Amino acid sequence: TASQLKVMTNYLCTVHLVALAEALTTCKAAGLDMNTTYEAIRISSGNSFVHETESQVILNGSRDINFTMDLVSKDIGLFDEMAQENNVPLELSPLIVRLFKEARAQYGDREFSPNIIRRYEEPLGLKVLGTGFPDQMVDDEPEETGYEVVPRR
């Protein structure tokens, strides 16, 4: 159903967000320039919609995408439940669920979800920041009706 597909795509976005948090923090710790790191990811096979949007507000420092950890936790929890109900033995999903559960306990339910990066920054005493990135992502594309998912045959 459409709601199951939405939960699945939100799960994928969350996995990308956590991977980006780890990658950006590792590059910062290695002394790489964050603007160069952003561009290197953007032009590579490691790019994603999540990188092009959420990495910018991470590197700005605002981390404001108007989506909070409690909402992420709800979606990834629903995905994990869907897998369990269908006897799919996942490994990454339970880890992501645990990471966000711990982050919510540490930072609060209403903390912006990109602040998952704090789990990596704080133990190292780092701030993963670049220059010239926007403090919010603005969707200025005109409203459209939704799309029907039509499988390729």
Explain the meaning of each model-derived region.
Residues A2-P123:
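Helical "substrate-binding/catalytic lid" subdomain
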Residues K101, A105-R153:
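NAD(P)-dependent dehydrogenase/reductase Rossmann-like domain
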